[in-house]
Amino acid sequence: MQRGEIWFAATPGGDRPVLVLTRDPVADRIGNVVVAALTRTVRGLVSELSLTPAEDGVPTECVVSFDNIHTVARTSLRHRVTTLSPARMARACRALDDALGC
């Protein structure tokens, strides 16, 4: 698993898509990874990153919500969907910075 990959993670409410944020050198070595949730609910916030099937390989138009960051067990990641391009990850980092405000 690598930073920038989108996976379906097993949650109590069913499988949900997430973007892996944990840095590459440790993502495969630790038990938990930091992820940001994907959602089809667009709020128009600077802390969101819009994704499309054509540009990003996601099944449907959605946003990564950097206001919804959490840690999940690495073993809960079930199925890799796609990997964001370096340019999209650069935008993701800007949205994450906006969300955290630091």
Model-inferred region functions:
Residues 1-102:
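Conserved functional hotspots at enzyme active or ligand-binding sites that engage polyanionic ligands
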